[in-house]
C-alpha cells in the first residue's frame, strides 16, 4: 500500500504515510520533563525559555529535547494575552521568575506522562488550567514557551521539520518568509 500510494499521489505522501504508520505503531513520544528559566532577549529584557524533553521508543537512550523562548514586543496592547512579570526591583519589575515557577511547578506536573504528539491536547490542558481569557493566571509567556518547546521536541523526535509537524497533510511546501516593511509601535 505504501509503495502504491507513493507512486500514485504527491511525492510528500511518503512522509505522511510513514509518519502515520509510526504514530499508529505506538504512542512513544511521551512528555517527560518541562523546565523553564529566565533568559535575556535581544533587547536585554527578561523572557521565559522552556525546555521539554520527550521519551522515544527506547526510554533509556531516546531522550529528545525541544526548547523555545518567547520574547515580548516592545509595545503591548490592552487586548493582548497577559505576560506574567514579577513587578519587583529586579530588571525594573520586568523579571519573569513567577512565570518560570508556573512552568516548573503547575505546568510540569500537569503535563508529565502526556502524549506529547497530541499538541492540541497539550495546549488545551494548559489553557484549561489557566482558565482566563487573557492567560493571566499561568501567563501567556509560560504557556507559549512550553507549547513551542513541545512542538520542537516532537518534530525532532519524528525527524521532520516543525512546519511539517504542525501542517500535517497540507504541509507540502515550506512556509514563505514574511517580514514587516512598515511597522508601528515602540522600538
Regions found by a protein language model. Name each.
Residues 1-4, 21:
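Methionine residue identity
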Residues 2, 9-12:
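Intrinsic-disorder-associated, low-complexity terminal segments enriched in Asp/Asn/His/Tyr and depleted
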Residues 12-47:
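Short, Gly/Pro- and small/polar-rich lid/capping loops
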Residues 30, 54, 120-135, 168-178:
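Short, hydrophobic/aliphatic alpha-helical segments
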Residues 40-41, 45-48, 134-155, 176-187:
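Conserved phosphate/anionic-ligand binding catalytic regions in large, soluble enzymes, centered on
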Residues 48-57:
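A short beta-strand signature
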Residues 64-71, 75-80, 163-187:
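Flexible glycine-/small-residue-enriched beta->alpha junction loops
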Residues 71-156, 160:
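Metal- or metallocofactor-binding catalytic centers and their adjacent structured scaffolds
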Amino acid at each position: 500500500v505504501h509503495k502504491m500510494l507513493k507512486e500514485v499521489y504527491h511525492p510528500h505522501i511518503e512522509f505522511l504515510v510513514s509518519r502515520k504508520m509510526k504514530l499508529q505503531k505506538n504512542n512513544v513520544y511521551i512528555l517527560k520533563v518541562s523546565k523553564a528559566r529566565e533568559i535575556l532577549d535581544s533587547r536585554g529584557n527578561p523572557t521565559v525559555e522552556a525546555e521539554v524533553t520527550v521519551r522515544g521508543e527506547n526510554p533509556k537512550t531516546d531522550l529528545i529535547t525541544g526548547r523555545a523562548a518567547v520574547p515580548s514586543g516592545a509595545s503591548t496592547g490592552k487586548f493582548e494575552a497577559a505576560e506574567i512579570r514579577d513587578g519587583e526591583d529586579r530588571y525594573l519589575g520586568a523579571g519573569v521568575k513567577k512565570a518560570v515557577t508556573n512552568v516548573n511547578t503547575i505546568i510540569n506536573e500537569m503535563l508529565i506522562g502526556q502524549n506529547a504528539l497530541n499538541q492540541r491536547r497539550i495546549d488545551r490542558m494548559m489553557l484549561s488550567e489557566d482558565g482566563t481569557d487573557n492567560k493571566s493566571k499561568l501567563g501567556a509567556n509560560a504557556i507559549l514557551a512550553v507549547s513551542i518547546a513541545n512542538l520542537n521536541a516532537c518534530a525532532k523526535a519524528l525527524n521532520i521539520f516543525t512546519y511539517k509537524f504542525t501542517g500535517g497533510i497540507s504541509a507540502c511546501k515550506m512556509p514563505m518568509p514574511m517580514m514587516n516593511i512598515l511597522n508601528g509601535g515602540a522600538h
